[in-house]
């Protein structure tokens, strides 16, 4: 079980640090055959121009290849170890299948070294097992949910997230997500029993600007302190408030303005997520 530790103020950079310490995690390096180089583009396109702001720098990482499909049916796997993954907020687990293959998966909460898990159409309802939504009882908590059958998990993959199965009707099941959104998903889509590990992630505090830079996040500059050539809120004599409703650097309204434009799947969303 992870511990939330508030660090002692031995220096200005440590004064506000809150760390998440999990002694069950593997102390060594990652499993080499399931890692690859992670080429960073730092938010630039092929012309070298910034297309995503606030990205760049940070510590070098190796990408862990995660098995989001879990399609080795009816072959039991043993959890060899739990690991930290710098590319995501959740922990990952290295599992060894009975046929000798090893895979990385998103580690659910409560999964321990030595546990046996399996995927298939009719497997036991226990943490870490994968099965179609049609075979999961109502009220169950699930994560790593597919949006299309056998495409791989797309919903509820980050630390502490999950969804609850609240209804079944025809070829669709209804899920309630942590965000408050209620949506329909095909019954043939698969999901993993339980919730994602490391729910304490939201309590973490990096404590200083430099730690944010270690994660590859660059500073966010307010529009009102820019020049008028750089932002609609820029310019003016002295300190100004922008003089208009909040917009992005390209003039799109922000702070509540809806930009979702996917009418094809709107019919599957029964209740939109809560406002932040």
Swiss-Prot record:
InterPro entries: NA-bd_OB-fold, Rib_uL2_dom2, Ribosomal_uL2, Ribosomal_uL2_bac/org-type, Ribosomal_uL2_C, Ribosomal_uL2_dom3, Ribosomal_uL2_RNA-bd_dom, Translation_prot_SH3-like_sf. One of its GO terms (cellular component) is large ribosomal subunit. Residues 226-276 are annotated as: Disordered. GO terms for molecular function: rRNA binding; structural constituent of ribosome; transferase activity. One of its GO terms (biological process) is cytoplasmic translation. Keywords: Ribonucleoprotein, Ribosomal protein, RNA-binding, rRNA-binding. It comes from the Bacteria. One of the primary rRNA binding proteins. Required for association of the 30S and 50S subunits to form the 70S ribosome, for tRNA binding and peptide bond formation. It has been suggested to have peptidyltransferase activity; this is somewhat controversial. Makes several contacts with the 16S rRNA in the 70S ribosome. Belongs to the universal ribosomal protein uL2 family. NCBIfam families: rplB_bact (TIGR01171). Part of the 50S ribosomal subunit. Forms a bridge to the 30S subunit in the 70S ribosome. This is Large ribosomal subunit protein uL2. It comes from Vesicomyosocius okutanii subsp. Calyptogena okutanii (strain HA).
């Amino acid at each position: 079980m992870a511990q939330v530790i508030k660090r002692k103020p031995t220096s200005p950079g440590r004064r506000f640090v809150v760390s998440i310490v999990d002694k069950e995690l593997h102390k060594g390096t990652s499993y080499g055959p399931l890692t690859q180089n992670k080429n960073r583009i730092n938010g630039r396109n092929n012309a070298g121009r910034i297309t995503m702001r606030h990205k760049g720098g940070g510590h070098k990482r190796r990408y862990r290849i995660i098995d989001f499909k879990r399609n080795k049916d009816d072959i039991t796997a043993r959890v060899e170890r739990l690991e930290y993954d710098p590319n995501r907020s959740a922990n990952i687990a290295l599992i060894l299948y009975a046929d000798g293959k090893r895979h990385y998966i998103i580690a659910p909460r409560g999964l321990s070294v030595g546990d046996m898990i399996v995927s298939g159409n009719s497997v036991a309802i226990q943490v870490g097992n994968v099965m179609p939504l049609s075979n999961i009882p109502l009220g169950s908590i699930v994560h790593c949910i597919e949006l299309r059958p056998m495409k791989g998990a797309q919903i509820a993959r980050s630390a502490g997230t999950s969804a609850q199965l609240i209804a079944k009707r025809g070829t669709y099941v209804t899920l309630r997500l942590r965000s408050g959104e209620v949506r329909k998903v095909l019954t043939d889509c698969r999901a993993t029993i339980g919730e994602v590990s490391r729910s304490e992630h939201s309590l973490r505090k990096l404590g200083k600007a430099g730690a944010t830079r270690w994660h590859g996040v660059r500073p966010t500059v307010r529009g009102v302190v820019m020049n008028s050539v750089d932002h609609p809120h820029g310019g003016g004599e002295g300190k100004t408030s922008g003089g208009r409703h909040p917009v992005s650097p390209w003039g799109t309204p922000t702070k509540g303005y809806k930009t979702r434009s996917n009418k094809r799947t709107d019919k599957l969303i029964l209740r939109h997520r809560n406002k932040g």
